[in-house]
C-alpha cells in the first residue's frame, strides 16, 4: 500500500517525482562518431573524444538534437529558442573526463505534461495528468562491473567499460505530481511507450536504454510542506519501480512516527530482498560546479526546422487509444493492450483495413498471436502470418465457412509459414458443414446409439444437450455449424 494512517496526525501522503534517462537510438554517440552498439567487447567503442584527451573537441550529433526535440514535442514541452551545454563536475571511475556534458539552466525543453491511465488494485481506472519539468540532453557515463558482488561494497575489485560513455541521453524530469508507486510505474511505462512510438529509443530496461531514478518523500496531508527527499536507484523494471516506491513510503513513515528524521540520501533498490539500502549522501546542484562548456556553442533550432520535425511525429499512444474506442468500439482494456506496442497497433489496423471486423481481430491478436509473438520473441512486423491473412481467417469465421475450432487447428501452421487460410481450408476439406440435411442425418445416428442419454434428457436432464453437441463435433471433426447443430439437436431431442 502507499498510504498509511498515523494514529496521532492523520493520513500520510507520498510525493514522488521521476528522472527518466532515455538512451537515444543513434548509431553514433552524442559528440563523436564512436559506435553505440550494445553488448560488444568492453572498451571497443571509445575514442579520444570520449576519453577527453588533450586537443579533442566535441561536435554535437544532429540526429541527437532531432530525437530530443521530437521527444520533447511528444511530451507537450515548450522547445527553447536558445539552449546550451554545461559541464557537470564530479569524480567517479565511470566518467573518463571527470566531468559530464549536460544541460543545466538552459535545457532544450521545459514545462510539459502527459496523461496516464492508472489501474490501482481494488479501484477504478483513472486518468491523471503528470507535469514534466524539463527534458535535457547529456552524455551517458561508462559502466562499472564489480567482481564478486553486484555493488561496490563486498566486491574484490571493479572493472570499467567505457563503451556506454558518450552515448546520447534525453533526461526527462517529472514534476512531483505522483502519489503512489502504481502511478510512478504507469508514468514510466507511458514514457517508454511514447519513445518507442517515436522511434527515438528502444526503451529496453534490461540493456539500460531506459533507466529511472525515483525521488520520494512523505508528508502529513496534501497541504503540508514537502518532506525530506530520498533518491532511489537500481530499478530495472516497472514492477521494481512500484515496489521500491511502496517500500520506501512505508520506511519513511516509520522513521517519522518513531520521532526520527529522514536523511537526504541516495538509496539502492535490492530486488532480491525487496527493500532499499543506503548508498551515499545526496549531492545538491552546487556540488557539481556547473559552468557552460567552452567547446560547444549555443543551440538554436530554427522554427521551420522545428515544425518540419513536428510534422513527422506519428499518432501517439494516448490519441490512438482514444481513436480505437471511438472508431472501432473497443473497450478501454482492448484499446490499451493493442496500442501498447507500435508494431501491434499497425498489425491490428492493417487487418481491419483488409475488411475484418475489429473486435474479432482484436481477440485473435490479444490471444493466440500475442502468445506466439512473446514466446518466440519476435515482432508483429516480422510475423509470417500477415495482417491481411488474419483478416481473411476472421472473415471465414464470421461468414460461417469455418468454426473457431478449425481456425485454431490451422493457426500454428499459419503463424510459422503464413499463407491463405481459405486455401488451406479448401485443400483439406475443412469447411464448415452447414447443410441442414447432412447435420440432421448425423444427429439421428447419434440419438440412435445413445438411447439412455436421450431418455435422460427427456426426463429433465437438459444439460445433456452439450454431450450430444460434443459427440456431433467429434464425429464431424469440429466442422458442423454450431448454431445449426444446436437448433437441430434441440428439436430432435425434444421429439
UniProtKB/Swiss-Prot annotation:
Enzymatic reactions: L-glutamyl-tRNA(Gln) + L-glutamine + ATP + H2O = L-glutaminyl-tRNA(Gln) + L-glutamate + ADP + phosphate + H(+); L-aspartyl-tRNA(Asn) + L-glutamine + ATP + H2O = L-asparaginyl-tRNA(Asn) + L-glutamate + ADP + phosphate + 2 H(+)
EC number: 6.3.5.-
Class of the enzyme per the UniProt entry, highest EC level: ligase
GO BP field: glutaminyl-tRNAGln biosynthesis via transamidation; translation
Annotated keywords: ATP-binding, Ligase, Nucleotide-binding, Protein biosynthesis
General function of this protein: Allows the formation of correctly charged Asn-tRNA(Asn) or Gln-tRNA(Gln) through the transamidation of misacylated Asp-tRNA(Asn) or Glu-tRNA(Gln) in organisms which lack either or both of asparaginyl-tRNA or glutaminyl-tRNA synthetases. The reaction takes place in the presence of glutamine and ATP through an activated phospho-Asp-tRNA(Asn) or phospho-Glu-tRNA(Gln).
Oligomer status and interactors: Heterotrimer of A, B and C subunits.
Name of this chain's protein: Aspartyl/glutamyl-tRNA(Asn/Gln) amidotransferase subunit B
Native species: Prochlorococcus marinus (strain MIT 9313)
Gene designation per UniProt: gatB
